[in-house]
From Swiss-Prot:
Name of the protein this chain belongs to: Retinoblastoma-related protein 3
UniProt cross-references to Gene3D superfamilies, sorted A to Z: 1.10.472.140, Cyclin-like
Region entry Spacer, spans: 617-727
Highest taxon in the source lineage: Eukaryota
Organism the protein comes from: Zea mays (Maize)
Segments of this protein annotated with the region Domain A: 416-616
Length: 1010
């Protein structure tokens, strides 16, 4: 379990002294890291030391939940996280001239890799959030830009892999496979050309975009670099025959059409590639000082043989002879000047497979949803690795070795995230861009058929909301360059994306109005088309699809919600309709919307500030007290005038909308978007209809019309038998929660090989909790309830299943996030038995014992193996939609029952004994019938990796030095707490025979992993 176990010594003063020595040692090592290895100035070092000291107690309690390795490794993680926060949040850290350091420097000095850093940094932020708020203000998370930096790393890793595959397909490399007769000098020459292309792309990327580093535009720039290489790299290094290569399929009478062929190969447009190539040529002239050859000259004739020169610019001696080395030096200097000003990452490392910073694993992790085929690095479950570098501050090396890591894979896949993004962008370019930027004639007729012509109001609103989303301030505060060309590109980019979102909004709105008019048998859609929240949701959904298509780094979901003033729960009401009414929507964008809806259902709709609570207090008045006590209600939705003023948007002389003030009075469901990430999904949620639900009274088989979905929660719904719109909406929402829970329960239970009846009991328990103990979902993740339900049902079913095993299975689930079981929200009542009060975050076992079991113990009894429902109750639970239980699952593979015995020596070289868990204070606190519900105090949520890695972790704990003193008295197997082991070692002969754990023991004891 998370946290340090209590020491077994009886000397309190001795413990204090050792803790002080350990803290002093950590501070000494941290000071050496700041001054000797990183060369920080006094001001930055002082701020870093302050943050380290204030978080020291949290570090001690996080030894089992951060990094997963030795205490020394966890300390290095913590130090790196502290330094990154200080470098980004402190005033001195905003400029490199003021003594700040980049993330790359921090990681090299700490001997960590970037993948492991991004795995652990979110945990650090959760644990020290209140301290960071006190030191740096409430907006520290936005200023930290952690998600944006992670997205940028993911994009660069994908682009580097894409570039590597394309280069190796076109040119000889230094891997020894393309040319058996190539000499060492030729290999180095090939590597230099590869390096030139990547550096040219990086400089172009910095010069062109100050903020909007989206994946699609970056890919266009990368393809333009390939075009430059094709016509300038010496012919002897080509890996293709220009006349016969299938790579160049577009030909004319004058030869191969290079631009058209590259567009066909890389799914871009000739117009976009021509513009990108023009910018690349301009950069070569401005920075490398190369002059283009006249069209009639004879330069580069060998390279242009059988190539149509139209639209191409050739530079004399750009990559010939002795000109390559000087060009590399100039590009290196240009790039270094840029990253030394504001850069966090030395992006040159992505062209080097062997760079120690890259590591292995996935950086997507749910926060960044990149479409495409299954990636090699989908799951990060391995313990963090210590990465050494011979010279931490040395520049990265470049290589073309096919030996890839998590970032580079030399095997050309049929579909990659980059190629998928380019294909999706093609849909936007071919289907949406040609549409008019004004409503069609049919849509105008719907607007004019309302009680009042709403044409001007709708156009007015769209201008303000899209202006709020697509502004320079929306895409971060940091600018990589002050070049005017970058600012011009920003303005062009935002205007293009804004127009695409506007056209998509009008297109889908027309289709929705057509369908709604058929449902209502009339064209008067005043109730829907005058609803402020509905239009904002539609605009937000359109903008999100445009941003998701281009894979922007800085405007990832849920940024559009905050800009539009809505919540994720609001947006979920239009997601299904949006997908249904846009037939041409690509599969990847449908998946994106589905994933957003799933993220909403699993956690974001339950967060503080969700408009769901405003409907829930109407549908379930009994919950209003708890909702108010926790402060969960949403804030009012900001007016259009407020949004326009906040983003400095001109209103264009249009008068304020007449219905805005009325909306504030009528719609009590208005909210401002929560600041934390939130998201949604739908497709998979409608596929599971085979489950009996004890809450069928709140689940409706059909979705209501949009008018009722966006009506005031207290308004009666005429199509639902007199119930309020809130009851209808909550019923639909709960039905989706039930289906999502069913899918995840089935998946996890089958992975754990649990029996069929256990699977159904778990589902029944979750349904009962949703119906009768809804408050357990408040501010929590649905998976936290599922994990606890599985363990509780396993306990009452007398199964040999530990929380550790459940977490190990959960780690393999595609939606797994470590925060789910490491940090569970609790709000301690004034008289809690542990003495704590107020808000807190605990591990899942503490939540299970302290909150979950007291709330659901009676429900567990009802779903237990001895429970028997009356025939009448069974008949009530069986609805017309019932089509049977879960399909048969694999049977449980039971663990052997081990006899209880005296302490057993488990090591030949160490005096280490393991004894079965004995009675504790819980014996006196729990009745015999209640003991079987609780989780073992010493149980861990840390999943094992493999026998060898587990033994290595045990040895690290045995041999580790903490605070200068070797740990010799206690052994943490991560299964039983140190206190239990110590008490067991103190009494060797008092063991009792094993008994049925469901009847006599307060907790389930587990055999050691050793």
């Amino acid at each position: 379990m998370e946290g340090f176990a209590k020491p077994s010594t009886s000397s309190g003063s001795g413990v204090t002294v050792r803790a002080s020595v350990a803290a002093a040692s950590i501070e000494e090592r941290f000071a050496d890291l700041c001054k000797a290895k990183l060369g920080l100035d006094e001001s930055t070092t002082r701020q870093a030391m302050q943050l380290l000291k204030e978080t020291n107690n949290i570090l001690k309690s996080s030894m089992s939940s951060l990094g997963g390795g030795s205490p020394e490794e966890i300390e290095r993680f913590w130090s790196a996280c502290v330094l990154y926060c200080v470098s980004r949040l402190s005033k001195a850290g905003r400029s490199k001239e003021d003594g700040s350091v980049s993330l790359c420097q921090i990681l090299r000095a700490s001997k960590l890799n970037i993948v492991d850093f991004f795995k652990e940094m979110p945990q650090f932020c959760i644990k020290v959030a209140h301290i960071l708020t006190g030191l740096y203000g409430s907006d520290w998370e936005k200023r930290l830009e952690l998600k944006e930096l992670q997205a940028n790393v993911v994009h660069l890793s994908l682009l580097s892999s894409y570039y590597k595959r394309a280069y190796q397909e076109l040119f000889l490399s230094n891997d020894g496979k393309s040319s058996d007769n190539s000499s060492e000098s030729n290999n180095q020459e090939a590597s230099d050309y590869y390096r030139f292309g990547w550096l040219l792309f990086l400089v172009l990327r910095i010069q062109t975009f100050s903020r909007f580093k989206d994946l699609v535009t970056s890919t266009n720039e990368l393809v333009s670099v390939l075009a430059v290489l094709i016509i300038h790299v010496p012919v002897r290094l080509r890996n293709f025959d220009i006349k016969d290569s299938s790579y160049f399929g577009k030909k004319s009478d004058r030869g191969v059409s290079l631009i058209a062929s590259l567009c066909e190969k890389h799914h871009t447009s000739e117009d976009e590639l021509s513009k990108a190539l023009e910018k690349t040529n301009t950069l070569i002239m401005d920075i490398l000082k190369k002059k283009p050859c006249p069209a009639t000259s004879a330069c580069q004739q060998d390279n242009l043989s059988f190539i149509d020169p139209e639209g191409l610019t050739v530079f004399k001696d750009l990559l010939q002879g002795d000109s390559l080395k000087p060009s590399l030096i100039i590009l290196e200097k240009e790039y270094e000047n840029a990253i030394n000003t504001k850069g966090e990452l030395d992006e040159r490392m992505f062209a080097n497979d062997e760079d120690s910073l890259l590591g292995s694993g996935s950086l997507s992790g749910g926060a960044i949803n990149l479409p495409g085929t299954k990636r090699k690095y989908d799951v990060m479950a391995s313990p963090a690795k210590s990465i050494s570098s011979p010279n931490p501050m040395s520049p990265p090396r470049f290589c073309l070795s096919p030996k890839g890591n998590g970032f580079c894979n030399s095997k050309m896949a049929p579909s990659t995230p980059v190629s998928t993004a380019m294909t999706t962008a093609k849909w936007l370019r071919n289907t949406v861009s040609p549409l008019p930027s004004r409503p069609s004639g049919e849509l105008l007729r719907f607007f004019s058929a309302c009680d009042k012509d709403l044409t001007d109001d709708i156009a007015h609103r769209a201008g303000i909301i899209l202006g709020a989303i697509f502004t320079s301030s929306s895409f971060g505060e940091r600018i990589c360059t002050s070049m005017r060309s970058a600012s011009r590109m920003d303005a062009i980019w935002t205007e293009q994306r804004k127009m695409e979102a506007l056209k998509l909004y009008y297109r889908v709105l027309e289709s929705m109005c057509r369908a709604e008019s058929q449902i209502l048998s009339g064209n008067n859609l005043t109730s829907l088309l005058s609803n402020e929240r509905f239009h904002r949701c539609m605009i937000a959904c359109s903008a999100e699809l445009v941003l998701a298509t281009h894979k922007t780094v800085t405007m990832m979901f849920p940024a559009v919600l905050e800009k539009t003033g809505i919540t994720a729960f609001d947006l979920s009401k239009v997601i299904e309709g949006f997908v249904r009414h846009e037939d041409t929507l690509p599969r990847e964008l449908k998946r994106h919307l589905n994933s957003l809806e799933e993220r909403l259902l699993e956690s974001m709709a339950w967060e503080k500030g969700s408009s769901m609570y405003n409907s829930l207090i109407v549908a379930r008045p009994a919950l209003s007290v708890e909702i108010s006590r926790l402060g969960l209600l949403a804030e009012p939705m900001p007016s259009l005038d407020a949004i326009a003023a906040h983003h400095n948007i001109s209103l264009g002389g249009l008068p304020p909308l007449p219905f805005q003030k009325q909306e504030r009075l009528q719609d009590k469901d208005e909210v401002r978007s929560p600041k934390r990430a939130c998201t949604e999904r739908r497709n998979v949620l409608v596929d599971s209809n085979s489950l009996r639900s004890p809450v069928k009274d709140i689940i409706k088989p059909k979705l209501p019309p949009l008018q009722s979905a966006f009506a005031s929660p207290t308004r009666p719904n005429p199509a639902a038998g007199g119930e309020t719109c809130a009851e209808t909406g909550i019923g639909v929402f709960f039905s989706k929660i039930s289906k999502l829970a069913a899918i995840r329960i089935r998946s996890l239970c089958e992975r754990l090989q649990l029996p069929q009846q256990v699977l159904e009991r778990v589902y029944s328990l979750v349904q009962q909790i949703l119906s009768q103990q809804t408050g357990l979902f408040f501010n929590r993740h649905i998976d936290q309830i599922i994990l606890c339900s599985i363990y509780g049902v396993a306990k009452i079913s007398q199964l040999e299943l530990s929380f550790k095993e459940i977490i190990f299975g959960y780690r393999k689930q595609p939606q797994c996030k470590p925060q789910v079981f490491r940090s569970v929200y609790v709000h301690w009542p004034p008289r809690s038995r542990n003495g704590k009060t107020g808000e807190d975050h605990v591990d899942i076992i503490t939540f299970y014992n302290e909150v979950f079991i007291p709330a659901v113990k009676s429900l567990l009894v009802e779903v237990g193996p001895g429970a028997s429902a009356s025939p009448k109750k069974k008949e009530e639970e069986k609805g017309p939609a019932d089509v049977g239980p879960f399909p048969e699952s694999p049977r449980l593979a039971r663990f052997p029952n081990l006899p209880d015995m005296s302490p057993k020596k488990v090591s030949a070289t160490h005096n280490v004994y393991v004894s079965p868990l004995r009675s504790s204070k819980m014996d006196t606190l729990l009745s015999p019938s209640s003991k079987s519900y609780y989780a073992c105090v010493g149980e861990s949520t840390y999943a094992f990796q493999s026998p060898s890695k587990d033994l290595k972790a045990i040895n690290n704990r045995l041999n580790s030095v903490s605070g200068g003193k070797k740990v010799s008295g206690r052994l943490n197997f991560d299964v039983v707490s140190d206190l239990v082991v110590a008490s067991s070692l103190g009494s060797d002969r008092d063991a009792k025979p094993a008994a049925d754990p469901a009847k006599t023991t307060p907790v389930k004891c587990e055999p050691s992993d050793s």
